[in-house]
């Protein structure tokens, strides 16, 4: 990559951000299309967020990704917020055009794309169990509701968080039935048989741990499992799904698809099919990476 005075800059802000897999993913797509763009990590401490955002805009950055811990804190610093980002209550992508900063959330787009491409799953009228009630769960629940899911149930250790998420989405998306249960309910005999899809939005699996008592063999025929975790590529949840013959996929496809959506927002171009996911897989295969 050769950077000149004409190179258009994109990047990612977070704290920390050195571990991010987004730079190789986006730069691979820029290179494949011959676009004079570059994507770089910008470490921005929480107490410097406002100054950092103003600086990026002043320097003419085309846009940037937003990761932990800034996805919510950035909201009041933006000029406009896209409807889906407003519903989710978090932003992971910002476009800068003529000094106007517009916030988007492409996580939901990424999830829906991955569900369709990896599992052939269409949410319309289907029942989905979402494990967790944090930021990733919020984007999942919102996107599934917007896509017409018939029923979305949130299972979480903190019942208050699960209830709050379900009730909020129920008020905003009346076309979908939202419910909540304590996480321990997933081990109850027969409970899983009511769902077409199970989505893990938590960090469970990253350290080789699993969900106690969760028996995927109880899922009905044709049901699927999606795990947002992508490191390791095969979590205990996915390993169990393979053993019992349940179609499943890891979070790599979602990570690539949300990046593709951000790429389109910034450039107006479509990344070559599979380019970003291949770059991610290559980086993950490099020793010392997540």
From Swiss-Prot:
A GO BP entry: shikimate metabolic process
Active site annotation, chain numbering: 71
The keyword NADP is annotated on this UniProt entry: yes
Molecular function as annotated in GO: NADP binding; shikimate 3-dehydrogenase (NADP+) activity
Gene3D superfamilies according to UniProt: Leucine Dehydrogenase, chain A, domain 1, NAD(P)-binding Rossmann-like Domain
Catalyses which reaction(s): shikimate + NADP(+) = 3-dehydroshikimate + NADPH + H(+)
EC number of this enzyme: 1.1.1.25
Pathway per the UniProt entry: Metabolic intermediate biosynthesis; chorismate biosynthesis; chorismate from D-erythrose 4-phosphate and phosphoenolpyruvate: step 4/7
GO annotations of cellular component type: cytosol
Source species, domain of life: Bacteria
Keywords carried by this UniProt record: Amino-acid biosynthesis, Aromatic amino acid biosynthesis, NADP, Oxidoreductase
Entry binding sites for shikimate: 20-22, 67, 92, 107, 230
Record: residues binding NADP(+): 132-136, 228, 251
Record-linked HAMAP family: Shikimate_DH_AroE (MF_00222)
Reported function: Involved in the biosynthesis of the chorismate, which leads to the biosynthesis of aromatic amino acids. Catalyzes the reversible NADPH linked reduction of 3-dehydroshikimate (DHSA) to yield shikimate (SA).
Assembly information from the UniProt record: Homodimer.
Family note: Belongs to the shikimate dehydrogenase family.
NCBIfam families: aroE
Protein name: Shikimate dehydrogenase (NADP(+))
Organism: Geobacter sp. (strain M21)
